[in-house]
C-alpha cells in the first residue's frame, strides 16, 4: 500500500474514533452537556465553586465565599476569585507535526484549553460529604483524552483540581509537564507570596485572600502581576508516555480565605491534608553516646549493642520516666546498628538475638524502637556500604567519597530499602524512622528510572512509596526525613518532620559568653533565614531542629556549665514550637538539675502544645545581635519566647496578632512572664495591640497570654514574685521589684489575704514602689597612658552578689578585623588571675575573670595576637553576677482550690536574679 493511502486510512480511523464518546467510568454513566455549554457547581456551607463551559471549550471558574461564613469570620464582604481555568500539558508529540506547529521536529508543544473540546461531565458524591466534579475533553488534533477533576470537602474553604490524560489509540506521546493551573486570575488586590519551588502562592482579594499550590513538594507554583494582570502557574514535571492507563497529576489547591489572614488559613488547610496529626513526640538518640566499633579509639562500653542499649534504657527509665513521670515515645538507634558492608543487615555480634529483646523491654514503658537509615549510604564509613552495594548489583552514582551515593530510585536498591524499612516495622515493632541524607537527581542510565529532571520525580515517588508502605504497617509511625529535604509545606503529606537546613549545630559569629549561647544564636539564625529571609511557609512544628545536645562525645556546652544557661537552651528548644523532642544526650552524665530542667520544660511544652504548635518568628536578625521571638497564638491564649543574643539590653515589640491565630475579639488578656522569673504586667491587653518586652543581656524569657478570668492563682501584677507553696486553697507568695501601680489583677478569687501578720484588702493591697539594691558601686575604668595596651578596672561588688565575673568584650576597629585576636592577662588586687575566653570566629570576643564580693582593682594587659603588630579597637567592660533581692510575703486564701498545671523550670533561688552592669568602655591602640 502506498504511503498516501496509509495516511488516508489513518485519517479516516482517527476521524471515526473522535466521533465516539469516551468510555464512562464504571458505575458512573457519562452525562453530556447540551450544545457544548454549561455551568457546573460544587458548594458547601462556606464556599461555592463554579466552572463554566462555553462553545465546547473550558471558559472560566470561580470560587466565592458565602455571606454567612464570611461574616462569621469577620470579613468585610464575601471574597471571590475567578480564573480563566486554563492549564497546560507540555507534550513531546510523536507525529508528523505537533498541533499548531508547521515543521516536523518542532517540539515540544504546550496543549491548553483551546486545544480541547468538551464532551461530558460527571458529578460524584464521595465519602465524608466530599463532592467531585469531572469534566471530560478530547484533543482536537491528536488522540489524547483529558479529564479535569474538582473536589470540595464538606467543610472545606478550598477546592482541589487535578488533570488526567490518556491515549487509547496511539500511546507514544511523551508528557513532560503537567501545568495544573496556567492562566489569568482576576480579583487580585496584591500578591502576598509569589510562590516558588515547593512553596504556595498567595494574594489578597477584596474581602479576603487566596492561595494556590500543587500538593507536591517538588512542584513549581508562581503568581505574578504583569501589566496589571495576575498570572498563575502551578505544575510539576512528569516524564512518562501517555498510554491507555492514563497519567494523573497531583492535586492543585485553590483556597479562599474570608479575611486577610491568608497564611493562618493556609496552615488550617495543611492540617487537613497532612499524613499524621501534629503531636508531641519525645525521643532519645544514641548518636553522641553509642556508635559502631569501627570508630577509632571508641570506648568498648560505648559500642552500640544489645547490652549497652539496654543499659541506656534502664538509665532513661530511672532518670526520666520514674523520677519525673515523663513519657519517652522512642528510643532511637542512630548510625552503627548495621553491618557497613551489607545491604542494611543488623550486626549479629552486637545483636545476637536481633532487636526484639530491646523492643520488648521498651514496650514496658510505652516506648517504641526507632531506627536511623541513610538512604543514599549514610555518612560514617559510607564508602564501605556504597562499594559493597555496587559490587552486589545495587544502583550507585559516582565513585569517590565526595559524590558516591546509592540511588533511591534504582529498581533494585529502591525495592531493597522499601523491604527493609517495612520488615523492621512488621517484625520488630519499629515506631520511628530517621531517614537521613537524600539526593533527588540521578542521570545514570540503567537504573530503571527516567533521567534528567524526571529523575527527581522518580526519587520523590520512591520515597513517597516507602512512606506509604510503613504507614500501612503502622499508621502511627513517626517519620523524620532529614538532610536533603527542603521546606515545602507539602512534605507533611508524607513525613512528620523534615530538616530545618543548616548544620546539626554550629556557633554564630556573634560574641557570646559561652559555647551554648553561640549555639542557640546559630540555630535561631537558621530559622530566621528559613522564615524571615526566605519567607518559607512551613509549620515550625514539623521541623527537626536537632534537639538538646549534651553527650559524652559531643556537647554544645561545657561539661560544667551554669544551670540557667543550659536551661535557656532547653526551654527555648521546646518553646520554639517543635513537635519532636529530641534528646541527643548521654543520660548518665546529666546532673539532677539538668534532668529537672529537661523534665519540667518538656512537661510544660506538652501541656501547652495546642498553642505552641502555631508558630511565627518575629523581631530582628540573631546574627546581627538583634532581639527576636517565637510567638504562638490560638484562640484567646498565647506564648512568646523571646531572646536577646547580645549583652546590651534590648526592648522587643510583639504584636498580639490575629493573623497568627489570636481570636480577633480576644480581650482582658493577662501578660505573664513565666521564665526566668515570674512577673505579671499591670494592665490587660486585647487582640491587635502590641506589647514591649524588656530583655536583659543574653536573656531568654518566656511569656504567656491568657484571659484574666481563667486565672486560678493570684495575679500579683507589677512585681516579680515566686510562689513558695500551694496547699489546697492556701498560697504563699514572695515578691520584690515592685513598680508604681502594682496590684492584684484578680481579687475576686481571693477569700482573704495576709501581709506582715495583718489581714489586708485583696482589692487594695499596700504595695509601695521599691528599688532594687545596687550590685556594684565605685566603678571606674581607666587607661594606663595613651596608646598603651593596659587599663585598670575598679569596683565594689556587693556582698549580696555571687558567681561574679568581670566580662570584657574586645571589639576591633575595621582596620584590625580579621587578623589574629589579642590575648589578655590580668591581676586582681596584685595577684595573677585566670582569664577565660570563648573562641569566636567573628570580629569580637569575650574574656571573663571570676571575682568575689568586695572592693577590687583589676589590672588588664592586652597583648597582640600571633604575628600581629597592631590592634586598634574598643573594650566594653561589664560586671555579671547573681544577686539576692530583699523579699516580702503575702499569704492568700483562695475561694476555690486551683489545679495548677506544669510550669517552666526555676533555675535561680527564691528572690535571686542575674544582673549585668556595664562599668564602661575604653579604647585601645597598640
What is each of the regions a protein language model found here?
Residues 44, 63, 244-250, 463-679, ...:
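Active-site-proximal substrate-binding groove within the catalytic cores of carbohydrate-active enzymes
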Residues 29, 53, 126-127, 131-186, ...:
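Acidic, contiguous internal or C-terminal segments within carbohydrate-active enzymes
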Residues 258-330, 334-338:
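An acidic-aromatic substrate-binding cleft motif
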Residues 37-136, 750-775:
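Acidic-aromatic substrate-binding/catalytic surfaces of carbohydrate-active enzymes
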Residues 33-36, 41-43, 168, 178-180, ...:
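Beta-strand-rich recognition/accessory modules
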Residues 284, 288-308, 368-428, 514-515:
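Active-site-adjacent "subsite" loops/lids of carbohydrate-active enzymes
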Residues 277-280, 284, 327-361, 382-412, ...:
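Aromatic- and acidic-residue-enriched carbohydrate-binding clefts of CAZyme catalytic domains
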Residues 615-626, 635-637, 642-805, 811-870, ...:
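C-terminal beta-sandwich/jelly-roll accessory domains of carbohydrate-active enzymes
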